[in-house]
């Protein structure tokens, strides 16, 4: 204390020394309390406001020294010993586990659904977690207040309560990557150490945190950029705009909680009206007076709830803000200076905390519902009394307990045994967990009170699967179902109200496809007996062949040969050709074929097996093909060419074609020139034959060069020739007197460099036989299917086709093609090599059509299938007809029991149920049984007086003083659940029984944090908007079944009807008065709708100008408050004025609907102020004013719609902005900061402000401060039409070059 005292005295002395201050500051009060982080902040802020920066810095230094000195003396350190675990933790955990055990028991008895159990578990753990946290704090507070961990967290130096909780309490529940909460909590803390399971679960949460941070930084940066762009041109340009407008400040509330107090909102503002004390009527403060901390406190203490202050939202300064409307600059707690770039400051203040907002809130399955309902626990033991007029309806809580829900506000009373009496107020919708006259213990939960209006939480439909924990038969008990068929014909079954699905235990065998049961319901089977069997049947029949190497993974193969063909005279040999193996086929007639399909592959109908090797139809070069008597048809694939139907002669006129595709300059010969063989026609290309050259070129690119062999005859006049070019000339036919060919030639006229000539081109003839030779073959065929090889001749070219080639060309191919006499075209033949029966060294080619059947491997008892055993019924070489059985697979029972559940009719999943002795339970009785045979009993129900059932089940028989139960499990399904099974179905363990449909609270607002801020500032339509009241009045609410019928009736009797979308919850009640713009259903409001509703409502009474102002004012207030709510909920404090500046930029424009007599265009976006001035002018001249609607622009839209096209273009959509500006001939007046930075001028803010402000004469400033203008440096400004050329370089400064070197 002495140290602190000395310190304060020092401050006073320093203050006294500061003689510059007009009045000596009051002595420093002695602050006698613990100083933590918050008090420290206040202390420094107070000193800063009172004594300025220098002394505050000195004081902060002194505080630092003080802190370190005592920390060192006290030896504050941290060791693992300081992590003291509260002793009551074990007992709290045990208590929670007992509660959960009870809930699980209720679940197994079928009293609550899976969802209710899950909800109960999660809520229990959350409560336990909180209790442990409280215990931890109180443990520290009482037993170890100087614990270093506790001091650190408590003072706010480092860490917070939730982190300390993880160190010494329990870590709590974690969410998995889908955002579902895992119902296994982490019960340990870091001091005790986590188990392996807990460690893995906890790493989920950690990963989520990291990913989130990474995404957040990017989003937050982009938000800041957009904010800077929208508000960069807001600069303080005037001292006082003189407006009498203002906004009403009131404390920002969220339900019953004060989020921002009025006092906090008032500090640093300027009053727009005098403030009068409500009781004494004395004036506390005048208009235009600044509100400091003391005045704010005085105003709040006088009980004033609303204060009219000036605000950037209502400032009338042109394109800027005046000092009075902005208020204090938060940097130094004095009125803001002229030329301050408040827009940029606002943008940074809103953008910077972005990284601290959590991004995605995970749908945590209704964990945060604790915040919505306030729990009432009994302060003492006693009896609960309800009033007579209490209206309630029965209600099932989210934990599956029965409770009562209040239909109207009321009270309940708790009476203690010693005459104590406590009255609890209950609001409508509250839940009572006890009945009238019930005895309650101390701290027992009596009721949960809903907080009115706060229930802005919306709910969403979610589904949860119910899974069978045992195999058996489904039995519905008291479960009415409703079937719906949709347009696609899918049927869904839903439960009409809640009921039970029982699964009666038994062994369920899944039958493989095609298996038929061989037992009947009620048969008794022993282990190993056959329950069902399946047969393996051949489709086509044939001869059985059992390959040796046929044991594959899945079982043994059996092959059945349907048909076969052998080339019994041809032998197969293998040759190595270019490093690859080739199979060659030598026939008896001396032909050699090469196999196109290698042995071991399959070929289908009409596919090529082999091709004849021959050189008779090979040409030297390319050429022209002509058919003489040959007939072809296209069969099979196009690339295989044309099949010859009738033989004849192929005529072949050779020519050599070189594809060049090079520049024409490389050509060495001329078109029509005759060249010798071996001439270099183009660089690096030589011709092989002598002949006439034809050059084909296009766009100076040499495409092709053709050399046509033949004899060239120059003629004087080609007109003498009677035979047309392109004709075939027979030997001895006279052309001209001197030319008589001695062989078949093809006539062509050419233009040579020497003149016209005739080219006689030789023609070669190739004879094609009608039928090719086929090697002999013998076919064996079962089941009447024939298979053979057919020889086919194919020509690859059509008649008259020009074949471009330099090398040889094959004109005819002879191929062997497989032909299956087809009634099953999908069959394929296998190609095999077999040894000759007489000479094993000779191999023959065989083609077989096979059917391969797979025998199952014997399965040793798998859980669901039972054990299978397969028997083969045929042997090698057997001949089998169509549909013959080859093997049988038997499914054997694993345990003895009684067969049940065989259903007639075609079921998709074939299953058989065997009820074994394991599924039965015998309970000895002492007295008369109180149940009858067939009854379904739950665990804990009495079978006889004093004998509870050990398990749930169905009573099978009662005899000889004992009851036989068939084990079963009940599952409770809620109304509306989608059923996945029908009554009597057989299910395996792990099958889905039903999907429970339930509503869960969306955590807080659907989107929180950054995305919500972005949604507000971009003025996006929220996903699930609420319905807003369009006119004030009283709600009239009636229900048609589930559908609400909602009307609002005004004072004059006008009725407005509202339609409520499904999934929206009403937050108004019958008879409630509502104002215009109030929400009627839950969900976030759409700001565009708000604006439209307010504008339309006020327009009828006030006219456009006032209506637009009021509507915009409401939306501005809504946006400012919503943004504040998000930031405050995350613990971030931002001054209202920053948000107001941004919101002002968003709400400054209107859209012209009808231009009247003005020069505006319909649809144009104009500043509200501009259009009001224009309309005022019209009113004077008597023209028709423009009609308009106010619009709300998101920050991106607003940035792109600024006056300055340079600023807009540098933000986004550069091309569009610049082209539009160019078309409209816009000029940029360089008013904002960004434009000037881009062009490289001095920015008109800070010291540069006065440089530009000289143009407009300012009214004399009323402040006593000296003006900031430096008079001796007047800027030289030339105003030239619409250009603004400015060189504000004073004369006596260094020239540019020197200046840049500095």
Swiss-Prot record:
It holds the Pfam family RNA_pol_Rpb1_3. Residues 1255-1267, 1280-1302 have a biased composition (Acidic residues). Residues 1-29, 1253-1302 are annotated as: Disordered. InterPro entries: DNA-dir_RpoC2_beta_pp, DNA-dir_RpoC_beta_prime, RNA_pol_Rpb1_3, RNA_pol_Rpb1_3_sf, RNA_pol_Rpb1_4, RNA_pol_Rpb1_5, Rpb1_funnel_sf. The keyword ATP-binding does not apply. Its cofactor is Zn(2+). Residues 1268-1277 have a biased composition (Low complexity). Zn(2+) binds at residues 241, 315, 322, 325. It catalyses: RNA(n) + a ribonucleoside 5'-triphosphate = RNA(n+1) + diphosphate. GO terms for cellular component: DNA-directed RNA polymerase complex. One of its GO terms (biological process) is DNA-templated transcription. Belongs to the RNA polymerase beta' chain family. RpoC2 subfamily. DNA-dependent RNA polymerase catalyzes the transcription of DNA into RNA using the four ribonucleoside triphosphates as substrates. In cyanobacteria the RNAP catalytic core is composed of 2 alpha, 1 beta, 1 beta', 1 gamma and 1 omega subunit. When a sigma factor is associated with the core the holoenzyme is formed, which can initiate transcription. This is DNA-directed RNA polymerase subunit beta'. The lineage of its organism: Bacteria, Bacillati, Cyanobacteriota, Cyanophyceae, Synechococcales.
């Amino acid at each position: 204390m002495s140290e602190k005292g000395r310190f304060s005295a020092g401050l006073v002395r320093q203050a006294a020394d500061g003689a510059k201050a007009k009045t000596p500051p009051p002595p420093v009060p002695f602050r006698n309390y613990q100083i933590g982080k918050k008090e420290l902040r206040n202390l420094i802020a107070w000193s800063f406001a009172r004594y300025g920066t220098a002394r505050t810095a000195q004081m902060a230094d002194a505080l630092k020294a003080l802190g370190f000195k005592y920390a060192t003396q006290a030896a504050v350190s941290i060791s693992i010993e300081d992590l003291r675990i509260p002793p009551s933790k074990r007992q709290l955990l045990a208590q929670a586990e007992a509660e959960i055990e009870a809930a699980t028991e209720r679940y197994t008895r079928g009293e609550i659904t899976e969802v209710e159990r899950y909800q109960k578990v999660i809520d229990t753990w959350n409560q336990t977690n909180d209790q442990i946290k409280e215990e931890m704090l109180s443990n520290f507070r009482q037993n170890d207040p100087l614990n270093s961990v506790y001091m650190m967290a408590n003072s706010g130096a480092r860490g917070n309560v939730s982190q300390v909780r993880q160190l010494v309490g329990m870590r709590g529940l974690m969410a998995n990557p889908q955002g579902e909460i895992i119902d296994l909590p982490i019960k340990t803390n870091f001091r005790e150490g986590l188990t392996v399971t807990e460690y893995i679960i906890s790493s989920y949460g950690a990963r989520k945190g990291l990913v989130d941070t990474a995404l957040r930084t990017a989003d937050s940066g982009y938000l800041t950029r957009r904010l800077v762009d929208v508000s960069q041109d807001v600069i303080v340009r005037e001292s006082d705009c003189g407006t009498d407008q203002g906004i009403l400040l009131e404390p920002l509330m969220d339900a019953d909680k004060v989020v921002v107090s009025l006092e906090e909102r008032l500090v640093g503002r300027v009053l727009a009206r005098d403030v009068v004390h409500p009781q004494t009527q004395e004036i506390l403060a005048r208009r235009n007076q600044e509100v400091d901390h003391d005045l704010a406190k005085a105003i709040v203490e006088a009980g004033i709830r609303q204060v009219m202050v000036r605000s950037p939202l209502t400032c009338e300064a042109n394109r800027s803000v005046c000092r009075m409307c902005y208020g204090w600059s938060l940097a130094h707690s004095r009125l803001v200076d002229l030329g301050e770039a408040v827009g940029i400051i606002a943008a940074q203040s809103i953008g910077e905390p972005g990284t601290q907002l959590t991004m995605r809130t995970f749908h945590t399955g209704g964990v945060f519902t604790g915040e919505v309902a306030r729990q009432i626990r009994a302060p003492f033991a006693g009896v609960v009394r309800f009033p007579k007029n209490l209206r309630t309806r029965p209600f099932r809580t989210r934990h599956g307990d029965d409770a009562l829900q209040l239909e109207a506000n009321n009270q309940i009373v708790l009476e203690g045994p010693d005459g104590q009496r406590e009255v609890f107020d209950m609001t409508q919708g509250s839940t009572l967990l006890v009945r009238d006259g019930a005895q309650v213990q101390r701290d027992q939960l009596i009721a949960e009170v809903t907080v009115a209006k706060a229930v802005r939480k919306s709910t969403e439909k979610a589904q949860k699967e119910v899974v069978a924990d045992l195999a058996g038969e489904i039995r519905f008990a008291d479960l009415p179902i409703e079937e719906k068929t949709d347009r696609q014909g899918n049927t869904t079954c839903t439960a009409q109200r809640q009921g039970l699905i029982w699964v009666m235990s038994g062994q369920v065998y899944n039958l493989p496809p095609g298996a038929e049961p061989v037992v009947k319901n009620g048969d008794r089977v022993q282990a190993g007996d056959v329950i069902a069997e399946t047969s393996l049947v051949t489709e086509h029949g044939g001869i059985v062949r059992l390959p040796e190497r046929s044991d594959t993974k899945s079982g043994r193969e059996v092959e059945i040969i349907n048909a076969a063909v052998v080339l019994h005279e041809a032998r197969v040999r293998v040759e190595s050709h270019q490093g690859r193996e080739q199979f060659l086929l030598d026939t008896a007639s001396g032909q050699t074929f090469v196999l196109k399909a290698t042995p071991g592959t399959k070929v289908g109908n009409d596919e090529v097996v082999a091709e004849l090797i021959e050189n008779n139809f090979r040409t030297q070069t390319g050429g022209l093909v002509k058919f003489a008597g040959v007939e072809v048809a296209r069969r099979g694939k196009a690339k295989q060419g044309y099949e010859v139907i009738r033989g004849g002669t192929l005529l072949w006129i050779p020519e050599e074609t070189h594809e060049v595709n090079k520049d024409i300059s490389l050509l060495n010969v001329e078109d029509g020139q005759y060249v010798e063989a071996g001439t270099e026609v183009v660089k690096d290309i030589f011709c092989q034959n002598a002949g006439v050259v034809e050059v084909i070129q296009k766009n100076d690119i040499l495409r092709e060069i053709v050399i046509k062999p033949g004899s060239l005859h120059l003629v004087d006049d080609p007109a003498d020739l009677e035979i047309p070019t392109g004709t075939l000339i027979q030997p001895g036919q006279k052309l001209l007197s001197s030319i008589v060919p001695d062989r078949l030639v093809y006539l062509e006229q050419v233009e040579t460099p020497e003149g016209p000539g005739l080219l006689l081109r030789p023609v070669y003839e190739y004879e094609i036989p009608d039928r090719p030779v086929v090697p002999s073959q013998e076919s064996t065929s079962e089941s009447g299917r024939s298979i053979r090889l057919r020889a086919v001749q194919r020509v690859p070219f059509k008649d008259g086709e020009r074949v471009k080639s330099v090398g040889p060309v094959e004109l005819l191919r002879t191929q062997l093609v497989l032909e299956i006499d087809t009634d099953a075209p999908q069959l394929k033949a296998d190609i095999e090599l077999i040894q000759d029966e007489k000479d094993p060294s000779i191999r023959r080619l065989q083609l077989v059509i096979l059917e391969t059947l797979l025998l199952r491997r014997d399965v040793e008892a798998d859980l669901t299938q039972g054990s299978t055993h397969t028997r083969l019924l045929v042997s090698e070489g057997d001949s089998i007809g169509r549909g013959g059985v080859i093997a049988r697979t038997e499914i054997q029972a694993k345990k003895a029991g009684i067969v049940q559940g065989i259903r007639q009719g075609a079921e998709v999943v074939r299953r058989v149920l065997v009820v074994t002795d394991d599924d039965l339970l015998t309970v000895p009785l002492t007295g008369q049984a109180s149940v009858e045979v067939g009854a379904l009993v739950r665990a804990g129900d009495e079978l006889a007086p004093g004998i509870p059932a050990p398990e749930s089940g169905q009573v099978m028989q009662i005899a000889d003083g004992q009851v036989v139960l068939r084990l079963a499990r009940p599952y409770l399904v809620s109304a509306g659940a989608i059923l996945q099974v029908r009554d009597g179905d057989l299910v395996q363990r792990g099958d889905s029984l039903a999907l429970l449909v339930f509503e869960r609270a969306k955590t807080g607002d659907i989107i929180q944090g950054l995305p919500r801020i972005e949604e507000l500032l971009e003025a996006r339509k929220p996903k699930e908007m609420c319905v807003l009241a369009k006119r004030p009045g009283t709600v009239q609410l009636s229900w048609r079944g589930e559908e609400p019928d909602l009307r609002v009736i005004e004072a004059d009797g006008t009725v407005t009807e509202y339609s409520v979308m499904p999934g929206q919850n009403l937050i108004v009640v019958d008879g409630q008065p509502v104002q215009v713009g109030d929400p009627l259903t839950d969900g976030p409001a759409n700001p565009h709708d708000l604006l439209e509703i307010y504008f339309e409502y006020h327009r009828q009474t006030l006219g456009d100008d006032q209506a637009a102002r009021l509507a915009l004012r409401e939306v501005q207030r809504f946006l400012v408050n919503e943004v504040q709510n998000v930031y405050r909920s995350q613990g971030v404090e931002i001054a209202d004025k920053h948000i107001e500046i941004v919101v002002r930029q968003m709400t400054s424009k209107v859209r012209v609907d009808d231009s009247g007599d003005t020069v505006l265009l319909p649809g144009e976006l104009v500043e509200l102020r501009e259009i009001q001035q224009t309309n005022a002018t019209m009113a004077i001249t008597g023209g028709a004013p423009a009609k308009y609607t106010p619009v709300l622009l998101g920050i991106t839209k607003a940035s792109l719609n600024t006056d300055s096209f340079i600023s807009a273009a540098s933000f986004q959509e550069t091309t569009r902005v610049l082209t539009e500006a160019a078309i409209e001939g816009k000029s940029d007046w360089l008013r904002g900061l960004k434009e000037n930075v881009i062009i490289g001028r001095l920015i008109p803010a800070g010291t540069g402000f006065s440089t530009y402000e000289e143009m407009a004469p300012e009214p004399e400033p009323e402040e006593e401060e000296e003006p900031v203008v430096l008079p001796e440096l007047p800027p030289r400004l030339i105003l030239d039409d619409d250009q603004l050329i400015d060189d504000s370089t004073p004369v006596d400064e260094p020239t540019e070059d020197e200046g840049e070197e500095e």
